[in-house]
């Protein structure tokens, strides 16, 4: 059996997947336009345009799995223009070499006001949510085996552009006040990115889970205030000072600012409970979520190392 697996993209998800695969002794070919990504003896970083079907097929020859971890700018127009075509290239390449494709997925396509489970309908429409629905349907219709691994908002090493990323963690570490969107005290699920990566790998290696949608192991729902407090504890910082940017403000600014409008589309996730349940998938995967205090500590350790690296540059 081949000992080669492909990862497209070296963002937080792709990097976490590549490192975990390498740590398991698997040869990884990490594909990006720039040849970037984490360093490891078993990670072969390649400059490849993964939107080029022939280039992706050629470099993936002999692989048993493709982890498709690329994305697009955070707006619906770019998602609709770029993501379906990019996923089709990955699916076609995998079909030609007999590989499974594993996708990280969000909760955007879910259309539930209650606890979100693997059995929920994923049929949201409009904007970015509608794009995610269309992508899930295309995967389901493909003859190529796929697994979509759903996570809530990320946090963890290398996570920057997220609600619990650079807008929160380094500020809390420094004892500064943060402002969160919607509400600081509504229950909200947060997924630790190494747990998502572990779930993607486990799913790829278990054919019984192919052609399904599963949930990454995700701990009990927190609130934005509670996760900020966890980072403060891990950093030995003063208690987190948390303010709120009301949803209506983001809505108003979104009328004149594109970036704010794209964020405002997701206000519903932070003005009422937004909670996923991963218990069924945890049984199937044989995995459980990393305890919050451990995950927060590992996140703070990464940020401290990153700050030291930046200061020394």
Predicted regions: what they are:
Residues 36-97:
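NAD(P)H-binding glycine-rich loop region in Rossmannoid oxidoreductase-like domains
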Residues 85-131, 147:
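Conserved Rossmann-fold NAD(P)-dependent oxidoreductase catalytic core, especially the SDR/UDP-sugar
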Residues 160-167, 181-205, 211-215:
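Substrate-positioning beta->alpha
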Residues 80-84, 121-140, 162-166, 189-190, ...:
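Short-chain dehydrogenase/reductase
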Residues 4-24:
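N-terminal Rossmann NAD(P)H-binding glycine-rich loop of SDR-like oxidoreductase domains
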Residues 2, 11, 200-262, 278, ...:
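Mid/C-terminal beta-alpha module of Rossmann-like enzyme folds, strongest
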Residues 31, 69-70, 101-106, 149-151:
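SDR active-site strand-loop-helix element
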Residues 106, 137-159:
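Conserved beta-loop-beta element that borders a ligand/cofactor-binding pocket
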């Amino acid at each position: 059996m081949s000992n080669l697996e492909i990862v497209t993209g070296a963002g937080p998800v792709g990097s976490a997947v590549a490192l975990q695969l390498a740590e398991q002794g698997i040869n990884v070919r990490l594909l990006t336009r720039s040849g970037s990504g984490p360093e490891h003896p078993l990670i072969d970083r390649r400059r490849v345009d993964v939107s080029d079907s022939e280039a992706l097929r050629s470099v993936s020859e002999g692989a048993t799995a493709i982890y498709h971890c690329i994305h697009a700018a955070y707006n619906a127009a770019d998602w609709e223009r770029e993501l379906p075509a990019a996923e089709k290239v990955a699916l076609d390449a995998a079909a030609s070499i007999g590989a499974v494709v594993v996708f990280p997925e969000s909760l955007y396509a879910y259309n539930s006001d209650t606890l979100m489970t693997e059995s929920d309908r994923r049929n949201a429409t409009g904007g970015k949510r509608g794009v995610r629905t269309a992508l899930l349907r295309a995967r389901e219709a493909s003859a190529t085996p796929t697994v979509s691994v759903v996570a809530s908002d990320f946090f963890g090493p290398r996570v920057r552009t997220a609600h619990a990323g650079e807008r929160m963690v380094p500020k809390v570490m420094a004892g500064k006040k943060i402002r969160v969107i919607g509400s600081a005290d509504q229950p909200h699920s947060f997924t630790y990115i190494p747990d998502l990566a572990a779930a993607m790998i486990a799913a790829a290696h278990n054919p019984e889970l192919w052609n399904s949608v599963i949930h990454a192991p995700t701990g009990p729902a927190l609130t934005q205030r509670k996760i900020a407090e966890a980072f403060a504890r891990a950093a030995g910082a003063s208690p987190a000072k948390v303010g709120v940017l009301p949803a209506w403000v983001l809505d108003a600014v979104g009328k004149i600012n594109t970036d704010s409008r794209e964020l405002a589309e997701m206000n519903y996730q932070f003005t009422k409970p937004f909670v996923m349940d991963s218990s069924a998938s945890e049984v199937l995967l044989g995995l459980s979520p990393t305890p919050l205090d451990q995950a927060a500590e590992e996140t703070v350790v990464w940020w401290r190392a990153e700050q030291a690296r930046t200061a020394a540059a």
